[in-house]
Amino acid sequence: LGDVYKRQVLAAVVALGASLAGCGSSGEETTQRYSWPLATASPEDTVTQIFAEKFAEEISELSDGRMKIQVYANSTLGGDRDLLETCADGDIPFVVQNTAPQVSFMGDLAVFDLPCVFDSLDECREKIDNPEFYELISNVYTEGGYHLLGMADQGFRVMSTNKPVYSFSDFKGQKIRTMENSYHLAFWKAIGANPTPMSFSEVYIGLQQHTIDAQENPYEVIVSNNLYEQQDYVVETNHLPHLISLIVNDDFFRDLPEDEQEIMTEAAKIATEYAREQSDARIADKIATIEESGTKILTLDDQTRAEIRKASKSVYASIEENIDPVIYNAYMDGIE
């Protein structure tokens, strides 16, 4: 029933968008109004949603209300995979989502699964914004049928656990829930942990019943799902950035007048910076919530991070073998 309902909603949204696209006086182009759907699979109180809403707001502002975007959150129009497919088909022009589910559609995006590349979020953002690298990644999206408008983030993914991690050896044997991603599994195995893929809906109970010791996610997810209530420690492994892409169907974008393309590009730029600022503020707030609960936050020293990188060499080699070497080298350029 859920899938049938979503298909009905999608059909209604597409029909509405088509009807609104023609609204306005035929003799007055400035009064023409558009209403295009933008979909996410994320809850409303997330950076993903903030990113989407800010983009829609700026589109309206920069076009003097002529261009309109309606945001649909909470998987209203489908889950991550559904949204990618319907965006590629052109039924939903815009999608905002994490890059992780996109790897199965665009293999070169596995570059973002390279572990422990960056020492800080600023370094990561500088890399994403590097014109040469951004163009390479944009081309990956174009080949997939999308146009990349912007890439924000939700900070780094960190580890929460009931077993403290003070040194590299403390990862050994920890039963940690991971996403169903071969590179993620390989990383945790490489550093001595015992990774266990599990549906996210089962994680809280798994921690509560001690079928797993640990899990990994951005701070926002750890707090919004109350996972910290079942954990004694949060370890700032910062092993992967949690990147959020804003994409549009490529044919749809190319068919727009040049001035509207420019409005979208500028709106996305503003929304990306805003989402990053909001993410930073929200992470600080989430950390305070965790600390107030009595859960301790642990940071890793340089030696431990160096040992993690050394142990992860096999993961680097595997990803390097499976993606465009130009993209791999551009991502790793300047990384010691």
Enumerate the predicted regions with their spans.
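N-terminal secretory/targeting leader peptides
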Residues: 24-123, 141-143, 147-336
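Short, small-residue-biased leader/transition segments that mark boundaries at the very start
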Residues: 1-5
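Sec-dependent N-terminal signal peptides
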Residues: 9-15
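C-terminal motif of bacterial Sec signal peptides marking the signal peptidase cleavage site
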Residues: 19-22
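A gly/proline- and charged-residue-enriched helix-loop-helix capping module
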Residues: 122-138
